[in-house]
Amino acid sequence: MKLKLFLLSVLLLVSGSSQAQRIKDIANVQGVRSNQLIGYGLVVGLPGTGEKTTYTEQTFKTMLKNFGINLPDNLRPKIKNVAVVAVHAEMPAFIKPGQTLDVTVSSLGEAKSLRGGTLLQTFLKGVDGNVYAIAQGSMVVSGFSAEGLDGSKVIQNTPTVGRIPNGGIVERTVTTPFSTGDHLTFNLRRADFSTAKRLADAINELLGPGMARPLDAASVQVSAPRDVSQRVSFLATLENIQVEPASESAKVIVNSRTGTIVVGREVRLLPAAVTHGGLTVTIAEATQVSQPNPLAGGQTVVTADTTIDVAEEDSRMFLFNPGTTLDELVRAVNLVGAAPSDVLAILEALKMAGALHGELIII
């Protein structure tokens, strides 16, 4: 049986010339960033979907002790409506004390569901160990689970993860270098020497020579006013300057799992001839029983009956001329009706032969 060939769907990055973009769309201000917070807490009020692990009991006892209630060490509280959870949030830049954060709550143990639970006061710490926010409140859980007495179970989405909108209150700010020093630095989201130079040139054209200088392929340093009150308007002006990013390097990106192929507009091919055929080998094995004559005195044996079928597809050769564009490449590949796996093999062979001018990236 011959292999069925499917039409390859190729995504093409074929935009014409690069278009100018605002600095705020291609770069970030160094030091102006969000920070991750994490904490460990208890969710209570669960309808029998909690857990009874040792660390859950220890955490529960510690919480009661903080409220002045001391339980005997040998007492194991029977709790089914409590779960230990990890609480995490993203703390945006410039957020002030008293403002709120959305927090995500995830079960750490064997709780079946967090639906209907309430998170008790939990400290959210940064990487430096300091407390920056406090989270508490009722959770929104989109998933649910149900289990019958016979062991049957239905689970939709993820019932062990929930969110608390505005459930975290900021208690401390994170200092940034935005208001200190004599310079501001723009970091490109995609490092490129040409783009870094163009960004510096665009700023110097507006502010004057020497105001901006590229430090490397990803960073451009700009002289900034020392007066902090002027920096906001200064940066607001800079981030709206139009810059034309440099063209991307020639790349072919292949997702071997989904068969998606993205071809950059700068990809070119040198002269090459390609032929690709498929060989299908089918092996079928069945067992048969060999029964001897009743008077022969032999033994019954099981024998294997193996059938091997080999089928080879007819393949066609196609030729790439000098300077072949990606459009011609796609047409040629679609012409032979190659499947994604076949196209990947062709691209790898072209790269090994030195005929593919571009970086081949397989993800």
From Swiss-Prot:
Kindly state a single biological-process term from the GO annotations of this entry.
bacterial-type flagellum-dependent cell motility
The main location is periplasm
Q: Where in the cell is it found?
A: Periplasm; Bacterial flagellum basal body
Q: Can you supply one Gene Ontology CC term for this chain's record?
A: outer membrane-bounded periplasmic space
Swiss-Prot/TrEMBL keywords = Bacterial flagellum, Periplasm, Signal
- Coiled-coil annotation reads none
Q: Which GO terms describe its molecular function?
A: structural molecule activity
* UniProt function note: Assembles around the rod to form the L-ring and probably protects the motor/basal body from shearing forces during rotation.
The UniProt similarity line reads:
Belongs to the FlgI family.
Annotated protein name in UniProt = Flagellar P-ring protein
Query: From which source organism is this entry?
Result: Shewanella woodyi (strain ATCC 51908 / MS32)
